[in-house]
Amino acid sequence: MKTRIFIGSSKEGLEIAEYIKLQLGTKYECYLWTDDIFKFNESFLYTLLKEASLFDFGILVATKDDLSTIRDKSFDTPRDNVIFEFGLFLGRLGPSRAFVIQESGAKLPTDLLGITVPQFEKTIPLANSTSLNNEIERISKTIDEKITLGELGLLPSTVLAIGYFYNFVSIVCESIHTKSDIKVDDAIFKKFELNIVIPKDLDADIKKRATVYFKSKTLKEIQFETSSRNFPVFVTYDNQSKDVLKLYDMPTTLGGIDKAIEMFMRKGHIGKTSQQKLLEERELRNFQTTLQNLIDNDAFCRNIVKIIQEE
């Protein structure tokens, strides 16, 4: 599941948008406004509002498209729709995930004063524009930094990951560290590994999905005792060495993402659209990122918890 980026521009700035897509396309899943973004029988605004929620980042290219007179002075300005779309992505994704890259000399709205806006000099060919290539690289580094962080968004993946961590993962790990050993099937274990299985998608009831997965792996269900309550977990171990007890869990709380997406999309049909599936991918990715950050920052968890993908 690659990070998805929307790249917008005016028709006049499309060449630069295409160049940015070319540079970033090897690392991310990039879409131009010309890439079948707009659907038949939907208004431009409705499509934009919906599509903005499907992307992890937005990059808008502000080129010198129009000559505008402001208070008796003439300025080269970007096309109005580019600024509008930047504002839309800014509102949907937040200031750390929406970028506007400005051609030198293009006047931006005064509301953006005080914000550091990447600027570039347009050259022919574009590959010779040192400033453009430098700014693309800076944006790429910022994106790389942001995708390692879990952030609160319109849908609930971050909150669900936090709840799952503190209500299950950290409790189990603390119990593991406070016990001298755990007995399963007359075997005593002193080493442990907790595997969190992230489903490939949300196309089925997660509880049923987990049952099918654990059965396919011939895992044994046990009641894992902690200071607060007993948790049903699935385990396996090497029958010969009986060295490491491997525990498995699939977060059933992920079903809340599916319900939230249905409400957000105002679903009135059976089945899933491509847009619903893209939202699911984004939220699953953010759930995993948030959970991994919490694990890495917990002394009890970081050495025994692994996040794995459903096979």
Swiss-Prot record:
Effector protein of a CBASS antiviral system with NAD(+) hydrolase activity. CBASS (cyclic oligonucleotide-based antiphage signaling system) provides immunity against bacteriophage. The CD-NTase protein synthesizes cyclic nucleotides in response to infection; these serve as specific second messenger signals. The signals activate a diverse range of effectors, leading to bacterial cell death and thus abortive phage infection. A type I-D CBASS(GG) system. Binds c-di-GMP, does not bind cUMP-AMP. Upon activation by c-di-GMP forms filaments which hydrolyze NAD(+); filament formation is required for enzyme activation. In the C-terminal section; belongs to the bacterial STING family. Coiled coil: none annotated. It is an enzyme of class 3 (hydrolase). Its EC number is 3.2.2.5. GO terms for biological process: defense response to virus. GO terms for molecular function: NAD+ nucleosidase activity; NADP+ nucleosidase activity; nucleotide binding. NAD(+) hydrolase activity is strongly stimulated by c-di-GMP, weakly by 3'3'-cGAMP, very weakly by c-di-AMP but not at all by 2'3'-cGAMP. Self-association of TIR domains is required for NADase activity. CDD domains: STING_bact-like. InterPro entries: CAP12/PCTIR_TIR_dom, Prok_STING. It catalyses: NAD(+) + H2O = ADP-D-ribose + nicotinamide + H(+). 3',3'-c-di-GMP binds at residues 168, 232, 249. Residues 157-311 are annotated as: STING domain. Residues 4-121 form the TIR domain. Forms homodimers; in the presence of c-di-GMP forms filaments with an ordered array of parallel-stacked subunits. The N-terminal TIR domain mediates NAD(+) hydrolase (NADase) activity. The cyclic nucleotide binds in the C-terminal bacterial STING region. Upon binding to c-di-GMP the STING region closes around the ligand, which is bound by residues from 2 adjacent subunits. STING-STING interactions are the main drivers of filamentation; rearrangements in the STING domain allow reorganization of packing of the TIR domains, forming the NADase active site; cross-filament contacts strengthen the assembly. It comes from the Bacteria. Keywords: Antiviral defense, Hydrolase, Nucleotide-binding. It holds the Pfam family prok_STING. This is CD-NTase-associated protein 12. It comes from Flavobacterium daejeonense.
